[in-house]
Amino acid sequence: CIPCDDFMPPAPKDIDKKVGRDLSSLVDMTVDVTLAMEDKVLGELRAWKPDCIVSDSICIWGKLYAKKLNVPFVCSTTTFAFNQQTARLMKQSLSELLRMLSGMPRINARLRQLRRHGYEIRQFYELLQNDNDTETIVYTSKEFQPMSETFSDKFTFTGPSIAVPKPSGHKKSRPLIYISLGTVLNRQEDFYISCMKALKSEALDVIMSVGGRTDISGLGVIPDNFQVIPRVNQLEVLQEADVFLTHCGMNSVSESLYFGVPMVLFPQQPEEGAVARRVQEVGAGIPLPGREASVIRESILQVLKNARFRVAAGGIGAAYFSSKASICFS
C-alpha cells in the first residue's frame, strides 16, 4: 500500500458543480494528481518492480505510470467500457458541446505539460477510452454492455460484484417504491417535495434516501406512507422494492437489475445518461420526462403496473448469474 493522501492536490471548492460535467476540469484534475504523486509513486513502483499494475479507469494516473514504466497494465472499469463507438452514446446538449470546445485550448495545454514530463499522450480521449489491446475487467455483463461486439477478447465482462444481505423476511402489504439520487448530486429539495406530493395519496409505501447534506426538516410535512432518511442499506431495500426511481449511477442500476427491480430513470450527469439509455433499450425502465408531481406519479405507476418492465429487468439480472463473477452472501 502506498499512502498518497499527503501528496494529493487540494480538491477545487466547486468540485460538486464540475464533477462529470466539465471535461477540461477532469483533465485538470488528472494532470494535477498525476504530477503531484509522480515522485512518490514512481519511486515506490521502481523499488517494487511489479509484474503488473491494475488501476481503476477513473484513476487515469495509474495507466500513465504503467505506460511510463513500461509495466503491463490492467484496467478495472466499474462503468461501461468506453471506446470510439460507444462514445457516440454520450449525447451532449449544445451548452455542454460549447463548454467542451471552449475548454480545448486548456486541455491541449495540460496534455503538453504531461508530454514534457515524459507521458506520451497525443489526444485527450486516450486518457478516457479503453483500447482493444489493453486487458480490461468490466463489472457488467456482456448483455448489458452497449455495443459489446466492438470490444476485443481482451475485455472480460465479469458482472457486478454484489454482497447480497440476507432477506429481512418482512412481509409487504402493498407495493414499495424506492427513491434515491445517489451520493453526490443529491441536494435537490424541490424534487423530493414533488415526489412526496406525487405519491402521498397512493396506496403504496415509499422509502426516499436524500443524502446527509439535505435538511429533512426543510422538506415540510412528511406523508404517512413515506420514510425520508439520509441513507439506507440499498441492497436490503432493493430486495423488497417494486420500482426504483434512480439517478442511474452504474452501481445503483446494476444492483437494481440484479434484484429484477424496474426503474424510473432520472440521470444527473452525462455518463448516467448513457446508463439510462441502455436501461431503456433493454426494456427495464422509462425516463422521467419532468420534475412535476404529476409526471413523477404517472411514470412510477406506469412502471409499477406494467409487468414487462420487471420481466426485462429480471432477464438482465439473470445474465449476471451466468457471468464469471461470484455473488457473495452476507
Where are these predicted regions, by residue range?
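Nucleotide-sugar-dependent glycosyltransferase catalytic domains
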Residues: C1-L176, G182-L204
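Short beta->alpha connector loops at strand-helix junctions that form conserved
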Residues: I2-P9, S76-T78, C248, L265-P270, ...
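Short acidic active-site motifs
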Residues: K40, V232-N233, V295, S299
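A donor-sugar binding/catalytic signature common to diverse glycosyltransferases
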Residues: I53-S55, I229-R277
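Catalytic donor nucleotide-activated moiety binding site of glycosyltransferases and closely related
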Residues: T183, I193-Q227
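C-terminal "capping" alpha-helix adjacent to the active site of nucleotide-linked donor transferases
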Residues: V282, I286, R291-R308
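A short, well-ordered alpha-helix in the C-terminal region of glycosyltransferases
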Residues: R308-S322
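C-terminal alpha-helical cap of glycosyltransferases
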Residues: S323-S330
